[in-house]
Design a protein with these regions (language model features):
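Conserved small/polar residues in nucleotide/adenosyl-binding loops
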Residues: 226-227
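Conserved P-loop NTPase "ATPase switch" module shared by AAA+ and STAND
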Residues: 75-101
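Short glycine-rich substrate-engagement loop in P-loop NTPases that contacts/grips substrate
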Residues: 50-66
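P-loop NTPase motor core
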Residues: 1-37
Length: 227
């Protein structure tokens, strides 16, 4: 409870080149408005005084206004999360080619502009936007907006974070033991682990942790399908 959470999920943005920019704006502005409504009691109703209708229609201006207001309050800390940051850009690149992709991520592209605002929002003493965590499939899009957003660190292959996502075998066995005790699991825990290992236990994100593969935390939950 140290931070107010500002959350985006770019998988919700349309990858149709005729709709993508508007879809991106609508998604970001909707999430920013949700953020203000959710934390209105902490931010103070006065925040709406700095968020006129025009600002609420432009993601960069909206984010900048929230950050400036929260920074002036001095006791607000914001953690920004972006899930699947490259979802729609990867689709554009693979479907429409580099021309449309570059329009979004280079020069005055709307994605590049948004990341420029994020970078700017984190600068300065006491900036409310303190931390960022961004996930995606590949670093391609991030590389293309990097000159604007050059404050991030790629932790994908850092050994320290190898088990950040997924279940270790120990965690899996604990979960399966619980379901076995509840009468949900027909097979023994050992039998289930043996069956799951070849299919769901091959996730490793660091070369130095090759013996610490993780189980896919989504797939191992479909216990009813392995009866």
């Amino acid at each position: 409870n140290q931070f107010l959470i500002m959350r985006f999920n770019f998988s919700e943005v349309s990858s149709n080149v005729n709709e993508v920019e508007l879809s991106f704006k609508l998604h970001c502005c909707s999430k920013l408005k949700d953020f203000v409504f959710k934390y209105e009691d902490l931010l103070g109703k006065e925040i709406w005084d700095v968020l006129d209708e025009k600002i609420q229609e432009e993601p960069g201006a909206f984010l900048s206004a929230i950050n400036s207001y929260a920074t002036r309050k001095k006791n607000i800390r914001i953690y920004l999360l972006i899930d699947e940051y490259d979802n729609f850009t990867n689709t554009i690149l693979s479907t429409y080619g580099t021309e449309f992709y570059r329009k979004a991520t280079h020069g005055e592209g709307f994605i590049r502009g948004f990341f420029n605002v994020i970078k700017s929002a984190t600068t300065g003493t006491g900036a409310a936007l303190e931390r960022l965590f961004i996930t995606g499939v590949s670093p391609v899009t991030m590389d293309d907006v990097t000159s604007g957003f050059n404050i991030g660190t790629n932790i994908t292959t850092d050994p320290w974070f190898n088990d950040l996502v997924g279940f270790s075998e120990k965690e899996l066995r604990e979960m399966l033991t619980y379901y076995k005790e509840q009468g949900v699991l027909i097979q023994s825990v050992d039998e289930t682990v043996v069956m799951m290992k070849p299919n769901y236990d091959n996730y490793c994100f660091s070369r130095s942790r090759l013996v610490d593969c993780m189980f896919n935390s989504d797939m191992v939950l479909y216990l009813s399908l392995i009866h």
